[in-house]
UniProtKB/Swiss-Prot annotation, chain B:
CDD domains: PEBP_euk (cd00866). This is Protein MOTHER of FT and TFL1. The modification N-acetylalanine is found at A2. Expressed in gametophytes and developing seeds.
Length: 179, 173
């Protein structure tokens, strides 16, 4: 009984030790990949919280990050179309919100194309598609700016900054892949 | 006349983006202290902010400035030609783009692969354009020729282009 317990303990310890070792070596890939971006801490925390990252290579990490961006862009498009523009009575603001929602949908589409580019290892295309995704939220902000007296909502500003940061990380990782 | 547009022909700016034209205006472009002459090399890190552009002409004339990259995403496979970086309209003659209406905000050159040409094209407008021009839906697959045709801008009155490529990693951080 005691020996089998000891045996079980040894097996458990060995298993967790080897998991720790392989997890640690891939943590190094995540860290070195994120070092090439301008948002190291954000990059590391976003990647580490994804279950696929321990076994991903640099290209895989880029894809994970693009996925994070797609989630952000799609949820922002939904937020703008569904929640916000439906509750607004001002016709001008409603139109701006609907147009903005469209832009964030286009950003998500661009990021979807980026995943395809990554699959095809067409990193130059991927770079341009990420640039486009990063640019669409600017268009939304400018639409607010063009209307006199219309304030740019804080929540949209926060989401815009978030998407820009995510795209910045992807661009950084792509730079490394192209080299 | 041909001699003054030769670099643009040699650089295939005329052909890939523009049709043959006779320059009738002056445009000076500076990134910081660096004066842009056709085909000069610019580091993307020095072009993060829009260049200083001064144009000739009378204050009652209005001009449009377009900055475009025909070599996106790479010069060997420019399937996204052109990638438009900046559009400013209704610039009064003798002034600069800050006095015009920025239709599309400046986006810095970020050439992912290869050496890209970045072309600044100046048009003289026949009438104010500001309210009619919408931001293009996407920066990719822009056509300067079609844009000029759509807003009746005619042929360019001045053009200058520079080259840029990605800087080595050690410089960018």
């Amino acid at each position: 009984m005691a020996t089998s317990l000891v045996f079980l303990l040894l097996v458990t310890l060995t298993f967790s030790a080897s998991t720790l070792i392989s997890a640690k070596s891939n943590a190094t890939i995540i860290e070195s990949t994120c070092k090439t971006t301008n948002y190291y801490k954000f990059c590391v925390s976003a990647l580490k919280s994804d279950p696929r990252s321990p076994t991903a290579d640099t290209k895989g990490l880029a894809a994970i990050m693009v996925g994070v961006g797609m989630t952000n862009a799609t949820s922002t498009a939904t937020y703008l179309a569904g929640n916000l523009s439906a509750t607004v009575n001002d016709a001008v603001l409603k139109k701006v919100l609907q147009d903005c929602s469209e832009k964030y949908t286009l950003a998500a589409d661009s990021l979807r194309l980026t995943i395809q580019d990554l699959d095809n290892e067409a990193y130059d295309y991927a770079s341009m598609h990420v640039l486009a995704a990063q640019d669409y939220p600017n268009v939304c902000r400018n639409m607010f700016r063009r209307v006199k007296g219309l304030a740019y909502p804080v929540e949209i500003r926060r989401r815009e900054a978030s998407l820009r940061r995510i795209c910045g990380v992807v661009s950084g990782i792509l730079d490394r892949l192209v080299e | 006349m041909a001699a003054s547009v030769d670099p643009l022909v040699v650089g295939r700016v005329i052909g890939d983006v523009l049709d043959m034209f006779i320059p009738t205006a002056n445009m000076s472009v500076y990134f910081g202290p660096k004066h842009i002459t056709n085909g000069c090399e610019i580091k993307p890190s020095t072009a993060v902010n829009p260049p200083k552009v001064n144009i000739s002409g009378h204050s009652d004339e209005l001009y449009t400035l377009v900055m475009t990259d025909p070599d996106a995403p790479s010069p060997s496979e420019p399937n996204m030609r052109e990638w438009v970086h900046w559009i400013v309209v209704d610039i009064p003659g003798g002034t600069n783009p800050s006095r015009g209406k920025e239709i599309l905000p400046y986006m810095e050159p970020r050439p992912p692969v290869g050496i890209h040409r970045y072309i600044l094209v100046l048009f003289r407008q026949n009438s104010p354009v500001g309210l009619m021009v919408q931001q293009p839906p996407s920066r990719a697959n822009f056509s300067t020729r079609m844009f000029a045709g759509h807003f009746d801008l005619g042929l360019p009155v001045a053009t200058v282009y520079f080259n840029a490529q990605k800087e080595p990693a050690s410089r960018r951080r």
